[in-house]
């Protein structure tokens, strides 16, 4: 396993790398490639994005051992979940590469998810010709299906969101902290992740919290995209936190997990979450579901 890396650069570090060009991004891509987890396909992908705050964020593709590739985390999805972890609400430009010199457009799945960010159609996508010698910029709208129009009155991905949910078992609130994003309690972190998750179509918010063998907690919330393609499930969102902040650990070091979701929603994450964790986590990993309404 590669040495741990930081998946976010502050604005001062970002400025030191200069303009968002292939030449300046190449060393960043090459730094991130060893942190991709593409054991099945052998095809690493890195996404680099620059936020409106001036910070730089990384995303890498993550394939889950023993599971079909449709459960994988795309580099662009990882990037968006990483933005959410750092409360970044706007992506100014994005670059995607497999080797540090050829830059390509986002895949069709991820174009749909990227479009969920407000004003994302104007975000610049860095592209190069096959030789990687010349960089050009194209708007994300170029790659979106015709007729896909954002609804102005619908909440957008990465915007501050608060789902009005409460745990059905009220006795659990005795153990819920006021500032759960900074605590190390699984129930708190999973509830917080569900509260700020993005599910405007299904109205089924959900969140997952994981704990490793050292006692460190990671969390993530559902990111929904039903226009044409797939969403990012809460387990995968929590795994982004694990990969980005888990010091390069293997998934087998995950020893407990909590899912918070609606009791009688139109969809459930429980079966998928259980299947993923049974495959990748510690064989004795404890998995609990807390229902909300």
Swiss-Prot record:
PROSITE patterns: CYT_DCMP_DEAMINASES_1 (PS00903), CYT_DCMP_DEAMINASES_2 (PS51747)
Pfam hit, one: dCMP_cyt_deam_2
Record EC number: 3.5.4.5
Keywords in alphabetical order: Hydrolase, Metal-binding, Zinc
Signal sequence interval, chain numbering: none
Active-site positions on this chain: 76
GO CC annotation terms, alphabetical: cytoplasm
Location of the CMP/dCMP-type deaminase domain: 20-151, 181-293
GO biological process, one term: cytidine deamination
Cofactor: Zn(2+)
UniProt remark on cofactor binding: Binds 1 zinc ion per subunit.
Reactions accelerated catalytically: cytidine + H2O + H(+) = uridine + NH4(+); 2'-deoxycytidine + H2O + H(+) = 2'-deoxyuridine + NH4(+)
Recorded family membership: Belongs to the cytidine and deoxycytidylate deaminase family.
Function: This enzyme scavenges exogenous and endogenous cytidine and 2'-deoxycytidine for UMP synthesis.
PANTHER family, alphabetized: CYTIDINE DEAMINASE, CYTIDINE DEAMINASE 8-RELATED
Subunit structure: Homodimer.
Record protein name field: Cytidine deaminase 8
């Amino acid at each position: 396993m590669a040495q741990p890396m930081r998946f976010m650069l502050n604005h001062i570090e970002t400025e030191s790398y200069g303009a968002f060009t292939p030449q300046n991004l190449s060393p960043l891509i090459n730094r991130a490639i060893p942190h991709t987890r593409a054991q099945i396909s052998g095809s690493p992908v890195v996404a680099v994005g620059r936020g409106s705050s001036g910070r730089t964020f990384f995303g890498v593709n993550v394939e889950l051992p023993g599971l079909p590739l449709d459960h994988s985390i795309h580099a662009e999805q990882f990037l968006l979940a990483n933005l959410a972890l750092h409360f970044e609400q706007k992506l100014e430009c994005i670059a995607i590469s497999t080797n540090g010199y050829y830059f390509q457009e986002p895949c069709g799945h991820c174009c749909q998810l990227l479009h969920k960010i407000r004003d994302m159609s104007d975000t610049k996508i860095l592209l190069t010709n096959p030789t990687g010698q010349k960089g050009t910029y194209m708007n994300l709208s170029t790659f979106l299906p015709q007729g896909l129009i954002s609804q102005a009155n619908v909440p957008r991905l990465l915007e501050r969101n608060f789902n009005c949910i409460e745990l059905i078992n009220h006795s659990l609130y005795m153990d819920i902290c006021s500032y759960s994003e900074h605590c190390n309690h699984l129930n708190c972190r999973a509830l917080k992740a569900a509260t700020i998750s993005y599910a405007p179509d299904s109205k089924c918010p959900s969140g997952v919290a994981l704990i490793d063998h050292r006692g460190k907690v990671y969390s993530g919330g559902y990111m929904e995209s039903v226009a044409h393609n797939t969403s990012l499930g809460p387990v995968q969102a929590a795994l982004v936190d694990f990969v980005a902040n888990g010091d390069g650990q293997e998934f087998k070091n995950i020893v407990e997990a909590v899912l918070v979701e609606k009791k009688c929603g139109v969809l459930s994450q429980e079966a998928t979450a259980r299947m993923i964790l049974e495959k990748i986590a510690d064989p004795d990993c404890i998995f609990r579901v807390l229902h909300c309404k």
